[in-house]
Amino acid sequence: MKTLLSTCISIFISFHFLAQASTYNLTVKVSGIEVKKGMVEYGLFRDAEKFTKIGGTYRMIRVKVDASEETVTFHNLPKGKYAVCIYLDENNNDQCDKNFFGIPTERFAFSNNLRPLLSAPSFEACSIYLNENKSIIIRADY
């Protein structure tokens, strides 16, 4: 009985460590923040269909703007493709304000530092493949 219990505990511990080893961290630094007020919202996406859609984030982090650079880390992410979209919520109203034509009036940026011309970039163009701990920089200086 002791052997069976020891074996079960060993298997459980092994699976626990394997599960932890297959997750990674993504650190995202936003640089070039000119207006030091409001919040930076980091949206992490895993699904191309939900990319840039309200409620489509896999995870989200909001931090108060205190400096020209802000950094957050998304922890325990499974291996796969991700894309990041950030916006600077200067008036702290929990939404990306837009003008009459639907164009954001608050600063925003995407992973891979893609700059949209007439529409948001695709998930594929912004995607990052995560198979190890990674750090990326997104420039908000436009």
Where are these regions (language model features)?
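A short tyrosine-centered beta-strand micro-motif
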Residues: Y82-I86
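Short, ordered, surface-exposed loop/turn motifs in non-cytosolic proteins
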Residues: V35-F45, K50-T52
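Extracellular beta-sheet/turn segments enriched in Thr/Pro/Gly and aliphatic residues
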Residues: E106-Y142
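Short proline/glycine- and polar residue-rich coil/turn motifs
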Residues: V63-S68, L130
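Bacterial Sec-dependent N-terminal signal peptides
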Residues: M1-T23
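Acidic, glycine-anchored loop motifs typical of Ca2+
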Residues: E90-D97
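Short, flexible loop/turn segments at beta-strand junctions in immunoglobulin-like
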Residues: F74-L77
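A short, amphipathic beta-strand motif
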Residues: Y24-G32
